[in-house]
């Protein structure tokens, strides 16, 4: 075993120790450890299961806290253990054992990198589930097909992450794709990961719907907002709501047009409209629509609070509803994020849900 390799491995452990100390302070390790002990006590109380919703929230919080506290504990013990193992394997000239230490240290580095990535989730709702609204821009079939492609892209991304997806509303295009759709994404840090996808997405391609095979440009809007749990209070005055029911349309079977089960809720002070038609029950659709409304009102309030700050930050573009954030040029095999400059050539992989590079770049740059 070469001295340089041994020194490099020891330096890696020293670096991990420093990064671990920094992240313990940043993430308030002791506070999270104390809270985890409280949550474990709550989760072991038999009375908790009389309130399934509360039990689910406690379970979710426990999982998030354990992901931070136990990982930091494991890194700390791993650093000490591997320091001793380096000494032992060097003394005994155990090359196989030393290789095992190198592999274990690489695993610790991966755990640390994952934790450092989570540092970028700095909004209160980042750990939450989220909703994604996708709306086709002007342009008929071209735009509707593009919206359908984005719908598939985000669905595939969620599947890759092991997230659960639920289609709350889907209005099919006349020939292809969708006019609009809303999907719910359930998973740890779903909102934190997807929130920077809000904006206008631009597609340039040779159209499969044009007999002359001309190049077309299409637009679709994406709006991502968090699902709000009981830890964030949103007050809604019933007098501010207009609730309409209608017969659901689109895919769903023969039953779907027989009753006015679909629900549309308009929040008149803000003009926000939400709708849900995925359930046979009008009551269930109304409950789901109310959750969507709470989430949109929360997102609106957060955006108002950040508006002044965003306006003052040089070089940071507005990522609101009307801004173009990404360009997909298929015939040139190029997809570029206009905010971060991140660019890839494998368009097929991206449209199949490989969004990690774009998301990581946007979070690192604080988009």
Curated annotation (Swiss-Prot):
Which Gene3D superfamilies has this protein been placed in? 3.30.160.20, 3.30.70.1660, Release factor
Residues where N5-methylglutamine is found = 254
Major site of localization recorded for this protein = cytoplasm
Entries under SMART domains matching the protein: PCRF
Q: Could you tell me which InterPro entries the record lists for this protein? A: PCRF, Pep_chain_release_fac_I, Pep_chain_release_fac_I_sf, PrfB
Note whether Membrane occurs among the keywords.
Answer: no
Q: Which HAMAP family match?
A: Rel_fac_2 (MF_00094)
Q: What does this protein do?
A: Peptide chain release factor 2 directs the termination of translation in response to the peptide chain termination codons UGA and UAA.
- What is the name of this protein? Peptide chain release factor 2
* Native organism: Neisseria meningitidis serogroup C / serotype 2a (strain ATCC 700532 / DSM 15464 / FAM18)
The gene name reads prfB
């Amino acid at each position: 075993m070469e001295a340089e390799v041994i020194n490099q491995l020891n330096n890696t452990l020293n670096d991990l120790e420093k990064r671990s100390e920094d992240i313990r302070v940043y993430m308030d390790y002791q506070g999270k450890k104390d809270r985890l002990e409280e949550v474990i006590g709550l989760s072991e109380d038999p009375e908790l299961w009389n309130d399934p919703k509360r039990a689910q929230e406690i379970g979710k919080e426990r999982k998030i806290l354990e992901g931070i506290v136990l990982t930091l504990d494991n890194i700390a013990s791993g650093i000490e253990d591997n320091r001793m193992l380096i000494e032992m394997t060097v003394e005994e000239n155990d090359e196989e054992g030393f290789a095992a230490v190198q592999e274990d240290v690489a695993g610790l580095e991966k755990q640390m990198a994952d934790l450092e990535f989570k540092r970028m989730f700095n909004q209160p709702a980042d750990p939450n589930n989220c909703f994604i609204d996708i709306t086709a821009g002007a342009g008929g079939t071209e735009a509707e097909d593009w919206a359908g492609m984005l719908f598939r892209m985000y669905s595939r991304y969620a599947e890759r992450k092991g997230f659960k997806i639920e289609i709350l509303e889907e209005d099919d295009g006349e020939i292809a794709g969708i006019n609009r759709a809303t999907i719910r994404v359930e998973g740890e840090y779903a909102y934190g990961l997807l929130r920077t996808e809000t904006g206008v997405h631009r597609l340039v391609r040779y159209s499969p719907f044009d007999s002359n095979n001309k190049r077309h440009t299409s637009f679709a809007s994406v709006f991502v907002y968090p699902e709000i749990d009981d830890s964030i209070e949103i007050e809604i005055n019933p007098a501010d709501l207009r609730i309409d029911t209608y017969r659901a349309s689109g895919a769903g079977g023969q039953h779907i047009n027989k009753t006015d089960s679909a629900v549309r809720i308009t929040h008149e002070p803000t003009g926000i409209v939400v709708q849900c038609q995925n359930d046979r029950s009008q009551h269930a659709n109304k409950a789901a629509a109310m959750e969507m409304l709470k989430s949109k009102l929360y997102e609106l309030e957060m955006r108002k609070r950040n508006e002044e700050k965003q306006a003052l930050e040089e070089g940071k573009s507005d990522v609101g509803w009307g801004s173009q954030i990404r360009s997909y040029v298929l015939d040139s095999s190029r997809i570029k994020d206009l905010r971060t400059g991140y660019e890839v050539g494998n368009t097929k992989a991206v449209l199949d849900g490989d969004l990690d590079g774009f998301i990581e770049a946007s979070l690192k740059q604080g988009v």
